[in-house]
């Protein structure tokens, strides 16, 4: 009897390769299922893995079966209806090879295929194909991160980095340099010996002939004494550590918490900013996030207060934009930082403040920002702030974006639209 001992390193997850192949093959269907799951989850569970379902028809493999046409000769037991040589009509629908998997008034149908995604896999699909737009400013920061690059050839190094071609070339040049004079003299001696050997033996100068033979032997010995490869010849590939320029980015999350924002609207805004927060934390290690809440006045808050504070009031949107500009001037130089802004509001604003918002964005923020997005959350018609911002989008389509969210189901599609990776 044969025994098979499985010593694979991933013994607890032996089908990992097959699983990854499955996830790659049905990436589009899984991404759509993840999108549905994000829309239906609570805020607390939005970043967790779990069960997702894709239509079974999307994972069916192609099969080869008999077609409806053609003729076959078979020997079948006879009966009172058929005699020898009769042709039997092929039954209709018998070649599809499917007997149906559930009761249906239409005669066909299949259950969805359900499986579980880990948290890591779920987040991979959630943020697949997304990036911060225009992330171009790179600086050598104080972070100790390097990459190894080739820096030519060195005379010393590790045995594993020896450059064989350069070493042999160096050895060959050394041997040529050290033996050039001896080889030249050896050619002269051999030429003279050839002349003497061409003479009749009776008239040959024997003393001279013997002396030349002895000199040729000494030259051969001296040339062969030169080592074929010396430690001096060894050359090594040199690699040095080169500091990696880092992209320094900051995202300003601006949320309207005024009295016109009811609890449902605030929950939609929070879900959007949670998605943005997870996206930045997962994809960009060195990204600052500044949280700003505003009603009639604005203030910078921490993560916990941003998502859980119940403070409310009137609506003056420009207060948040002024605070954002002040923070940029104080802490984030546009020469070094990639600056982004995301603003969520129901669009309601006080009096003529919308014009002030437009002037602040055009004159102060957009010259410093790489990208600014405004998300209006309302099931009704657009408010004055949206109409004012449309003028800004018309003038700066690459740096300013507008999106409209009606309900929870629109959050994830809008998020992907804002941060979809641009094709070069």
UniProtKB/Swiss-Prot annotation:
InterPro entries membership: UPF0229
Chain segments carrying region Disordered: 61-112
Disulfide bonds: none
Family of this protein: Belongs to the UPF0229 family.
HAMAP family tied to this protein: UPF0229 (MF_01232)
Name of the protein this chain belongs to: UPF0229 protein CJA_2563
Source organism: Cellvibrio japonicus (strain Ueda107)
């Amino acid at each position: 009897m044969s025994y098979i001992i499985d010593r694979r390193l991933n013994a607890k997850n032996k089908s990992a390769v097959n699983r990854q192949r499955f996830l790659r093959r049905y990436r589009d269907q899984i991404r759509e299922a993840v999108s549905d799951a994000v829309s239906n989850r609570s805020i607390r569970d939005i970043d967790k893995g779990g069960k997702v379902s894709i239509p079974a028809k999307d994972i069916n493999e192609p099969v080869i079966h008999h077609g409806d046409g053609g003729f076959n000769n078979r020997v079948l037991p006879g009966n009172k209806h058929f005699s020898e040589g009769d042709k039997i009509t092929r039954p209709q629908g018998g070649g599809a090879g499917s007997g149906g998997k559930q009761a249906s008034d239409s005669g066909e149908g299949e259950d969805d295929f359900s499986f579980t995604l880990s948290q890591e896999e779920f987040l991979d699909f959630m943020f697949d194909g997304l990036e911060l737009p225009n992330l171009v400013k790179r600086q050598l920061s104080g972070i100790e991160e390097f990459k190894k690059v080739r820096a030519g050839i060195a005379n010393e190094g590790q045995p594993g980095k020896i450059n064989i071609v350069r070493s042999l070339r160096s050895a060959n040049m050394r041997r040529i340099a050290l033996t050039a004079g001896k080889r030249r003299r050896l050619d002269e001696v051999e030429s003279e010996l050839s002349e003497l050997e061409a003479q009749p033996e009776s008239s040959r100068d024997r003393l001279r002939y013997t002396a030349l033979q002895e000199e040729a032997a000494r030259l051969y010995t001296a040339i062969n004494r030169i080592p074929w490869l010396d430690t001096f010849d060894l050359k090594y590939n040199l690699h040095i550590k080169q500091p990696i320029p880092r992209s320094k980015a900051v995202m300003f999350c601006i949320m309207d918490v005024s009295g016109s924002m009811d609890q449902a609207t605030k929950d939609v805004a929070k879900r959007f900013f949670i998605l943005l927060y997870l996206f930045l934390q997962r994809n960009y290690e060195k990204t600052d996030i500044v949280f700003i809440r505003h009603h009639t006045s604005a203030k910078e808050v921490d993560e916990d207060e941003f998502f859980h504070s119940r403070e409310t009031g009137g609506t003056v949107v420009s207060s948040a934009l002024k605070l954002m500009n002040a923070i940029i001037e104080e802490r984030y130089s546009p020469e070094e930082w990639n600056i982004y802004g995301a603003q969520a509001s129901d669009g309601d604003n006080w009096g003529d403040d919308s014009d002030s918002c437009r002037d602040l964005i055009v004159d102060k923020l957009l010259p410093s920002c790489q990208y600014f997005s405004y998300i209006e959350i309302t099931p009704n018609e657009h408010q004055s702030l949206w109409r004012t911002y449309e003028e800004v989008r018309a003038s700066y389509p690459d740096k300013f974006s507008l999106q409209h969210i009606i309900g929870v189901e629109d959050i994830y599609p809008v998020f992907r639209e804002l941060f979809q990776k641009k094709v070069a």
